[in-house]
Structure formats: structure tokens, C-alpha cells
From Swiss-Prot:
Binds 1 copper B ion per subunit. Binds 2 heme groups per subunit. Residues 536-563 are annotated as: Disordered. GO terms for molecular function: cytochrome-c oxidase activity; heme binding; metal ion binding. This is Putative cytochrome c oxidase subunit 1-beta. GO terms for cellular component: plasma membrane. It is a multi-pass membrane protein. Belongs to the heme-copper respiratory oxidase family. Its cofactor is Cu(2+); heme. The lineage of its organism: Bacteria, Bacillati, Actinomycetota, Actinomycetes, Kitasatosporales. It is an enzyme of class 7 (translocase).
Length: 563
């Protein structure tokens, strides 16, 4: 037996053929590879949606129709909004959750690896169906990403492109629902010994709350989409305007739509919360209040949907206005936590910290204009104007894109075993930051001056030309900022040095920084003891470990008592 074992271990390791590599990735159930697939696919959708935005901005730079006609413009903003929210932002959450969450709780994988794989394929093919509507003769859907009735009816949107939009989103939505079931089960049932709920990293907490929100919001969207398809193809009349169907659609859609904004915000808040303590050299300020604020946002986000419907005159304005003001309070608490962590910290502005700081500035602007829009008298004046477009992009782009790039630069060594180039990262950040604010800051003024959203053209006499031209210049700078990032990824993959340590930043706090870069197939060779919410810091800096230790659970104490 000893000889056989020696011979077995002496066999040379076979290099994997390209064909086998492709099959391995297509059939993988490894949460890290599935996370890679989510992030790569969603970033590809981000690039496609960005090109659509640049075409629209090029059209709006000057009065008159230059590039696209009215219907093509409608198709562009419909697909742009759909792609960015449902095919980029939402699956990017799933990508980061797959990559990082099992590592942070000390789990070898997610609870249902095959369901995880199915979730990705549902998202991919749902997204391809939506994008495939570009190839049909009648063109893609042109009714806006919230598909208001009666515009979404067969009479007003007769092409097959609208049906592909509906069924593609339903399919991708089922993938999101199944993925959230997986994340919830993993967090509740697969934590490492010692990893109590109140020792979990904030990103994992936010993944938990986001998954709960998905299970409340996405089934409503899926049901509404399937009923809409029944209206279009089987003659049911649920969303018929004569039966009040137009308002019914708005209620159903926004009951999904507003939680969706927090579905694509909370996990990215979590990413920022992971980055700031590492580059402040301090534990997160107010760990418990951060969790409480996230719980409050989760609860409040399902009772504010009708602030999107103030202009209908058919909703209770005082209630929805008050609840919309109220949701700003826990968000403000988070800001105190983030700035409190940075205060008196030993700050260093490596690229991930730059993105986190850029997020704080951008999201603060978006939050302040959100408080303005929560007031019905003010909302009546700027609803469906570029003021709303600017607010929405400050909130969503300011959160999702800044935090996504921050997460990429922060966890890239954990994903790939190589560090992205810092100089290129800083060029990337500053070009994107300047381009973003140049694009969207002026749109607040355009909206206040009365420029409606979703118009393909305007008159020179309207006085919108100068600000639109400036916004378009900013948009192209914003688009160009992606080039240094893509070059950085290529350069790092080709020439980057291998990371030899578990924690290349030196001050990582959560459990993913206690395993190799990249981790082995089942994540950990050995698990360190978890005695606080910063197990990696405790392991690598034992002199400072447990400066504010939490009491250990009774069952752990009992396990160590001599029998």
C-alpha cells in the first residue's frame, strides 16, 4: 500500500486543456467561479447599457434630430434602464455575494451549489432574451423601463420585442429569487463555529437583508410580468385602463421598484462598510447601529412605493411623504457610522478608499435631492423632469458603480491572486468622478428649468443647449474612464505579480483575509477561531486582538469546560 501511495503522489499533474477549461466553467458549482461569471456577465451588460447612454447623450447635445429618431430614442432609454438596473446592478450584487459571503462566514460553499448555477443561467438567458429583442424586425420594447399601462398593451406596443422584454425579465427574476433563497439559507445555516449573527461582517448582514427584500419584491414583479403577457397574448384584461389597470400596474410595479432601489443599494453599502475600516485602521464605528439602520431601511423600503405616484393624485400623500422622509434617518445613521470610522483614523487613500470616498460624496448629493422629492409640492414641479433623472443617477450610479469598482480594487487579489495597478486605478477613479459629476450635476438645473425626461429633442429657444452640451461632454469622459480599468485588468492578468500573503492590505478584518489569494476549492485549509467581528485582524495582529471583546456564547464556553 505504501508503494502504491508513493507512486500515486509522484504522478505529474496534467495541465488542463482549453476545451476542458470551458466545460469546467460552464458546469461549475463552485461559488467563486459562479461569482466570476456573474461579475463578468453583468459588467458586459454595463458596457452595453453605457454605449446606449452615450448614443442618447450624443443625440441630446444639440437641438434637432441628429442620430436616432423618436422611436429609436424610446427603445434606447427603455433598454438602458432595464439593463443597468436588472441586468447589471442586481446581478452584480449576486456576484459579490457569491464571491465573498461564504468566505466571510467560514463556509466551504453556498447551501445549494447546483441551484446557484441554475440561478446564473436563468439570469444569463433572461438577459440575452431581453437583448435579443434588438434583432427582431419590430425592434425592442419602447415603453420605458417601468412599462406603464396602457403603453405596455398589445395595441400600443404590438411588436414581439415587448414580449421578449417581459419574458426575459421574468426569467432573470426567477434566477434572482432562487439566488436569494440560497444566500439566506447559507447565512442562516452554514456559518463557521463561533460565527454568531452579531459577529458577521456588515457585508454579510446586508446580503441577508437584501435577500429578504428580493423575496418580498421580485415575486410581485414576476407575477405582474406574467399577467401582462397574459393580457397581451391570451386576451385577459387585468391591466386594461377601463378597469383601473393603469394604476394597478403602477402599484404592482413600484411595490417591486422601490425595494429594488434598496436591493441594489444595501449590498453596495456593505462593500463600502468593508473598505472604510481597513483603510482607516479602525474597527467600524457603531457596528450594532449599522445593523439596526439596515434593518430599518429594509422595513421602510416596502412602505414608500407610492412616492413614485404622487402625480397620479390617487395616493395618500401625507403617509407616503412622511415615510419617505423617515427612510432618510437610518441612511443618515449609516453616514455617521462611515464618517465616524474615518474620524481620527490612520487614513490612507489607496484606490479602494478613493472609491469609498467618492461614493460618500455622490450618494450624499443623491440623498439630499431625494429628501426634496419626498415633498409632494416640490415633487409636483419636477416630476418626470431631468431633476429626477439626476437624482436617480446620483443615488444609483453613486452607489452601485462607485462601490462596484471599490469592491473590484479591494477584493481583486482575493478573486484572482493578483493586485490591480494603483496608478491606473487612480486615473480610472478621477476620470470617472469628474465625468460623472459633469454629466449629472447640471441635469438638476435642466430639470428645474423644465426639461422633461425621455424627450429625444428640444428647441434652441428652450435654453437647454449649453447645459445639455456640457452634460454630453461629461458623459463621454465618463465612458472613456472605463478604458484605464479594462487596460488595468488586462495588464494585471498578463504581468501582475502573484500575491503571496492572505491579506495584502495588511489590515483586513473579516474572515476572507485569513485564507489564500485566491482561496482553495472549499475556501479554507484551517479556520481561525472567531472571537469578534474582526477575526482576520485578531489573527494577524494578536497584540491588538479583542480590545473590545464580545462575551462568548454559552455553548462555546461549555464546549471548552473540562468534562
Amino acid at each position: 500500500m505504501g508503494t502504491d501511495t508513493a507512486q500515486a503522489t509522484a504522478r505529474p499533474v496534467r495541465t488542463q486543456q482549453p476545451g476542458r477549461l470551458i466545460v469546467d466553467w460552464l458546469t461549475t458549482t463552485d461559488h467563486k467561479k459562479i461569482g466570476h461569471l456573474y461579475l463578468i456577465t453583468s459588467f458586459a451588460f454595463f458596457l452595453i447599457g453605457g454605449v446606449m447612454a452615450l448614443v442618447m447623450r450624443a443625440e441630446l447635445a444639440r437641438p434637432g434630430m441628429q442620430i436616432v429618431d423618436n422611436n429609436q430614442f424610446n427603445q434606447l432609454f427603455t433598454l438602458h434602464g432595464t439593463i443597468m438596473l436588472l441586468l447589471f446592478a442586481t446581478p452584480t450584487f449576486a456576484g459579490f455575494a457569491n464571491e465573498i459571503m461564504p468566505l466571510q462566514i467560514g463556509s466551504p460553499d453556498v447551501a445549494f451549489p447546483r441551484l446557484n448555477m441554475l440561478s446564473y443561467w436563468l439570469f444569463l438567458f433572461g438577459g440575452l432574451i431581453v437583448l435579443g429583442s434588438l434583432a427582431v424586425p419590430s425592434g425592442p420594447a419602447a415603453f420605458g423601463w417601468f412599462a406603464y399601462a396602457p403603453l405596455n398593451s398589445l395595441e400600443r406596443s404590438p411588436g414581439i420585442g415587448a414580449d421578449m422584454w417581459i419574458m426575459g425579465l421574468a426569467l432573470a427574476g426567477f434566477g434572482t429569487i432562487l439566488g436569494s433563497v440560497n444566500f439566506l439559507t447559507t447565512i442562516i445555516g452554514m456559518r463557521a463555529p463561533g460565527m454568531t449573527m452579531f459577529r458577521m461582517p456588515i457585508f454579510t448582514w446586508n446580503t441577508l437583508f437584501t435577500s429578504i427584500l428580493v423575496l418580498m419584491a421580485f415575486p410581485v414583479l414576476a407575477a405582474a410580468l406574467l399577467v401582462l403577457e397574459a393580457d397581451r397574448r391570451f386576451g385577459s384584461q387585468v391591466f386594461d385602463a377601463a378597469n383601473g389597470g393603469a394604476l394597478l400596474w403602477q402599484h404592482l410595479f413600484w411595490f417591486f421598484g422601490h425595494p429594488e432601489v434598496y436591493i441594489i443599494a444595501l449590498p453596495f453599502f456593505g462593500i463600502i462598510t468593508e473598505i472604510i475600516p481597513v483603510f482607516s485602521r479602525k474597527p467600524i464605528f457603531g457596528y450594532l447601529t449599522l445593523i439596526g439602520a439596515t434593518a430599518a431601511i429594509t422595513g421602510l423600503s416596502v412602505v414608500v412605493w407610492a412616492h413614485h405616484m404622487f402625480a397620479t393624485g390617487a395616493v395618500l400623500l401625507p403617509f407616503f411623504s412622511f415615510m419617505s422622509f423617515l427612510i432618510a434617518v437610518p441612511t443618515g445613521v449609516k453616514f455617521f457610522n462611515w464618517t465616524g470610522t474615518m474620524l481620527k483614523g490612520s487614513l490612507s487613500f489607496e484606490t479602494p478608499m478613493l472609491w469609498a470616498t467618492g461614493f460618500l460624496v455622490s450618494f450624499l448629493f443623491g440623498g439630499l435631492t431625494g429628501v426634496i422629492l419626498a415633498s409632494p409640492p416640490l415633487d409636483f414641479h419636477v416630476t418626470d423632469s431631468y431633476f429626477v433623472v439626476a437624482h436617480f443617477h446620483y443615488v444609483v450610479f453613486g452607489t452601485v458603480v462607485f462601490a462596484t469598482f471599490g469592491g473590484f480594487y479591494f477584493w481583486w487579489p482575493k478573486f484572482t491572486g493578483k493586485m490591480l495597478d494603483e496608478r491606473l486605478g487612480k486615473i480610472h477613479f478621477w476620470t470617472l468622478f469628474v465625468g460623472f459629476h459633469t454629466t449629472f450635476l447640471v441635469q438638476h438645473w435642466l430639470g428645474a428649468e423644465g426639461m422633461p425626461r425621455r424627450y429625444a429633442d428640444y428647441l434652441a429657444a428652450d435654453g437647454f443647449t449649453a447645459l445639455n452640451t456640457l452634460s454630453t461632454i461629461g458623459a463621454f469622459l465618463l465612458g472613456m474612464s472605463t478604458l484605464p480599468f479594462l487596460y488595468n485588468v488586462w495588464k494585471t492578468a498578463r504581468y501582475g505579480r502573484k500575491v503571496e500573503v492572505d491579506d495584502p492590505w495588511g489590515f483586513g478584518r473579516s474572515l476572507e483575509w485569513t485564507t489564500s489569494c485566491p482561496p482553495p476549492r472549499h475556501n479554507f485549509v484551517t479556520l481561525p477561531r472567531v472571537r469578534s467581528e474582526s477575526p482576520a485582524f485578531d489573527l494577524h495582529h494578536p497584540a491588538h486582538a479583542g480590545e473590545a471583546p464580545q462575551p462568548e456564547p454559552k455553548h462555546e464556553q461549555a464546549d471548552r469546560e473540562p468534562s
